[in-house]
Curated annotation (Swiss-Prot):
Its main location: membrane. Its EC number is 2.3.1.-. It is found in: Cell membrane. The lineage of its organism: Bacteria, Pseudomonadati, Campylobacterota, Epsilonproteobacteria, Campylobacterales. One of its GO terms (cellular component) is plasma membrane. This is Peptidoglycan O-acetyltransferase. GO terms for biological process: alginic acid biosynthetic process; cell wall organization. It comes from Helicobacter pylori (strain ATCC 700392 / 26695) (Campylobacter pylori).
Length: 527
């Protein structure tokens, strides 16, 4: 039945920035949830409604992969249950290892099989056929979330067992729940919702069970909260504006430079790289803003994922501001288990590089992603060594110089992140260093014609594209470096007439762009 309904509707697109989502799916999901909260006799029905709505949202992309998501949820919950119940501790560790291997294998099969086959054929001159697998949507995200859950379940049990033994030896009542009480239908629904909750399912933020599951249990979140709805609408409007007005239109410049041009002059290359740097930021942060806003409709507070990353004065500061939830995962579940800062300095550098190599490879199966991760790992190691030197010699770099170095490194590294292959990356980099000539002229005739063609198809031509390059750059600079970011507005938890007016204006402009142009997917859907 579900497959039939979805197949009929597949002519439409179910993305945050589409009319079908904004005017149909979201209102139905919202109303259904709070109606059930108010009138359902069984308190599990509202949670079940959200789980089913989230699964429908996921299945809309490709219903064939719905069993994969459901199977992953059931399997990981079962493994966590066995970790909780099994004695002795050695068997707990075996269940944890089994769960980790299964999750990594599932992700590796879909994401990296073709990459390894291609490179194996290249090295050994063999002719194994690639499988041309379609990457299941969100698999990189829900896999990480469940890996963290398994590891934390294991660590929590390691802490609980000595405490329980201590209580027994003291002949005191055991306050901790016995292992058999771990499973319940309510707890399973909380877990399923933690993994599948549709605002964050597809591209994050990478949520942690400790910050999500208690919110699903909180009875105060079961009632309509008009302040949360108003604030959520405001944050959603910011994200929608970032996506459809800025990111989608900046993409035209980046796509031309990376995919269409055969060579790039100095100005063209820098315009290409900067366009992608801002496109990626506004696209991904726009998605996260929209996810946070939607979460607030349901009284669920998702973690902040961006904090003005392009204002960073060093690469460490950048990773405290960019994709914050991924940085948290890499730190807590890779860097610290490898020794963190407690090991010898050379080992710390090795760990930094290794962690970011894995982080780069997590983003995509390609040498360009590996190089991007390697560059960031090396940069973090260099920054760490530099920080030690500055403390020793009492030297401080001027802030403007520190910002210029940091931003330009980030912009350069994004070239590898965006390029389809090394040849495309080198094409842009050659232009950026002036190997194709340093010219202060306008874009080539081909690029100009392309931009003019884009302009003619836009309703907002007279407002936004009278001088496309200049006005878009001014808008991006103002938003990125001058205005308060959405995380500050989110944390303020207050609505006033300025925010209300801004939300109405941003939504109006966003809707104009939605109906004036074709919808595009979010960039991080590809990862």
């Amino acid at each position: 039945m579900l497959a039939s309904i979805i197949s009929i509707l597949r002519v439409f697109v179910l993305l945050f920035n589409t009319p079908l989502f904004i005017f149909a799916f979201l209102p139905v999901g919202f109303l259904g949830y709070f109606i059930l909260q108010a009138y359902a006799k069984n308190p599990l029905f509202p949670k079940l409604w959200l789980v089913l709505a989230s699964l429908f949202f996921y299945a809309f992309w490709n219903v064939k992969y719905l069993p994969l998501l459901v199977g992953s949820i059931v399997f990981n919950y079962f493994v966590a249950l066995k970790i909780h119940q099994t004695q002795p501790n050695a068997y707990k560790r075996l269940w944890l290892i089994l769960g980790l291997i299964a999750n990594v294998s599932l992700l590796g099969f879909f994401k990296y099989t073709d990459f390894f086959l291609t490179n194996f054929n290249l090295i050994w001159k063999s002719h194994f056929e690639t499988l041309h697998l379609i990457l299941p949507l969100a698999i990189s995200f829900f896999t990480l979330q469940q890996i963290a859950y398994l590891m934390d379940t294991y660590k929590q049990n390691q802490i609980m067992q000595p405490k329980m033994r201590e209580r027994v030896s003291e002949n005191a009542p055991i306050l901790l729940n016995p292992p058999t009480s771990f499973f319940s239908l309510s707890h399973f629904l909380d877990y399923a919702l933690f993994v599948s909750f549709f605002p964050q399912l597809i591209a994050g933020p990478i949520v942690h069970h400790s910050e999500m599951m208690p919110q699903f249990k909180d009875k105060n979140n079961q009632y309509l909260n008009y302040r949360n709805i108003a604030l959520g609408l405001f944050i959603f409007s910011i994200g929608l504006f970032k996506k459809v007005v800025i990111a989608d239109n900046t993409a035209h410049f980046a796509d031309f430079g990376f995919d269409k041009a055969t060579s790039l002059s100095f100005i063209q290359a820098w315009m290409t790289s900067l366009s992608y740097s801002f496109q990626l930021y506004f696209d991904f942060s726009g998605y996260c803003d929209m996810a946070i806003g939607i979460g607030l409709f349901f009284n669920i507070k998702l973690p902040i994922n961006f904090n003005s990353p392009y204002k960073a004065l060093n690469i460490q500061d950048f990773w405290r501001r960019w994709h914050i939830t991924l940085s948290r995962f890499l730190k807590e579940y890779l860097y610290i288990p490898l020794g963190g800062n407690r090991v010898k300095e050379l080992i710390v550098y090795r760990n930094l590089i290794l962690v970011f190599l894995i982080g780069g490879f997590w983003h995509g199966a390609g040498w360009t992603f590996i190089i991007w991760g390697l560059l960031h790992g090396i940069a973090l190691s260099v920054h760490r060594a530099y920080s030690h030197a500055t403390r020793k010699f009492h030297f401080t770099m001027p802030k403007i110089l520190a910002w210029l170095i940091t931003f330009n490194f980030i912009n350069l590294a994004w070239v590898f992140f965006r390029a389809k292959n090394l040849e495309s990356a080198l094409k842009v980099l050659k232009g950026m260093v002036g190997l194709n000539g340093v010219s202060l002229c306008h874009l080539s005739k081909e690029a100009s014609e392309f931009l003019n063609r884009v302009n003619d198809n836009m309703i907002m031509h007279t407002i936004m594209y009278a001088s496309p390059t200049f006005k878009m750059c001014v808008l991006m600079i103002i938003i990125s470096f001058c205005l308060k970011n959405s995380s500050h507005l989110y944390q303020s938890n207050q609505m006033d007439w300025i925010k209300t007016t801004s939300a109405c204006l941003l939504l109006s402009i966003g809707f104009l762009f939605i109906f004036a142009s074709s919808q595009s997917v979010f960039l991080y859907f590809n990862f």
